[in-house]
């Protein structure tokens, strides 16, 4: 994986406004100054998070891509591998509002979104905001809550607002739901429905650290986020400015066709219950644009698509066969995706 700050290869591409004239370097879509500012913002975030998250540079990179794309993130892994610490490291490196919701079986939807309470003095109902009203929301162990409570996140993840008693209430910007969950075969968990899974831009897995990285963690005795001393290195305004640039990152027609071929191939793949939705295809486009921006480019390459197919599509696909071990489904889906991508010609 290439990281911001690495030298970029010279790339030639077509500008659709030039009648097919081949251009090199940066385009007019994103100004050089704005691109540089966005790159520097995420360089600072990356450096800050790596101080805490040892040996997981690719995971950190995907988290930042998700943030830049304005999406939501689901991290699924065993207890104790750093899911919550990853969320705290992101939140503490930004100057923004943060809240944590511990999902349990007795959590109610109103505990998440808020509730209208009658105010005797005002002689009217007043809306008391829930913890969902923050910029970074850690939905910890989301699959321990009932499906009814999980569904409380559907509207806010899609529309950045919650509706209580028929009245819509907008959440702040930027807004990112960072959800964690234990594997579905753990006792006391409720699998997220497909409609909920589709709201997440990516699903990531952290895994155990390498021996050297784990030894460094043991030496530093950083157990839990309370011991982490971090300072904010980016403001909400800087994040919003970078997010606004993502949609301006250029995607050549041939790269869009390449993306669409991958999407279409998942719909005819016999191993999958159903293929990727239109929302899924748009999610991959948005993530690819964000990755290009973080790497200092204002145009998308096929490599951006290839690197993100797994994190963006993996949780949106399920195996067609009736019975299977849940622990085997993810690698089987990833294997099928790799086969699909490998069979599609890369545009020149």
Feature-to-residue mapping (PLM):
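Short, positively charged and aromatic/hydrophobic N-terminal segments
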Residues: 3, 13-16, 21-22
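C-terminal engagement/docking regions of AAA+ P-loop ATPases
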Residues: 27-29, 268-348
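Pre-Walker A (pre-P-loop) alpha-helix and adjacent loop at the N terminus of AAA/AAA+ ATPase modules
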Residues: 36-73, 78
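Conserved alpha-helical scaffold flanking the Walker A/P-loop in AAA+ ATPase domains
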Residues: 62-64, 118-138
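Walker A/P-loop
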Residues: 68-104
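Conserved beta-strand position immediately N-terminal to the Walker
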Residues: 73, 137, 175
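Canonical AAA+ ATPase core
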Residues: 119-124, 145, 149, 157-248, ...
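Walker B catalytic acidic pair
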Residues: 140-141, 152
């Amino acid at each position: 994986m290439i990281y911001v700050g690495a030298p970029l290869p010279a790339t030639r591409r077509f500008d659709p406004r030039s009648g097919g004239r081949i251009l090199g370097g940066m385009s007019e879509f994103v100004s050089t100054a704005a691109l540089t500012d966005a790159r520097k913002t995420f360089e600072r975030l990356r450096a800050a998070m790596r101080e805490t998250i040892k040996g997981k540079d690719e995971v950190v990179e995907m988290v930042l891509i998700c943030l830049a794309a304005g999406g939501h993130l689901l991290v699924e892994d065993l207890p104790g591998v750093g899911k919550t610490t990853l969320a705290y490291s992101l939140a503490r490196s930004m100057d923004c509002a943060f809240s944590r919701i511990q999902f349990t079986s007795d959590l109610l939807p109103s505990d998440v979104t808020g509730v209208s309470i009658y105010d005797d003095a005002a002689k009217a109902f007043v809306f008391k905001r829930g913890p969902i009203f923050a910029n970074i929301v850690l939905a910890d162990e989301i699959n321990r809550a009932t499906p009814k409570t999980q569904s409380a996140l559907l509207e806010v993840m899609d529309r950045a607002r919650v509706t209580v008693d028929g009245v819509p209430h907008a959440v702040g910007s930027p807004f990112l739901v960072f959800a964690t969950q234990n594997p579905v075969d753990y006792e006391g968990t409720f699998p997220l429905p497909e409609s909920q899974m589709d709201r997440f831009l990516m699903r990531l897995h952290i895994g155990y650290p390498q021996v050297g990285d784990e030894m460094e963690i043991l030496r530093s005795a950083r157990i839990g986020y309370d011991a982490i001393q971090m300072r904010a290195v980016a403001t909400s305004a800087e994040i919003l400015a970078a997010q606004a640039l993502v949609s301006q990152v250029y995607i050549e027609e041939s790269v869009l066709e390449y993306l669409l071929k991958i999407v279409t191939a998942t719909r005819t793949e016999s191993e999958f219950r159903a293929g990727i939705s239109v929302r899924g295809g748009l999610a991959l486009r948005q993530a690819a644009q964000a990755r290009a921006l973080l790497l200092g480019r204002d145009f998308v390459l096929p490599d951006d698509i290839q690197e993100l197919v797994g994190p963006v599509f993996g949780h949106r696909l399920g195996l067609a066969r009736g019975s299977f071990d849940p622990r085997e489904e993810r690698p089987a889906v990833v294997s099928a995706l790799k086969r699909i991508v490998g069979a599609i010609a890369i545009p020149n």
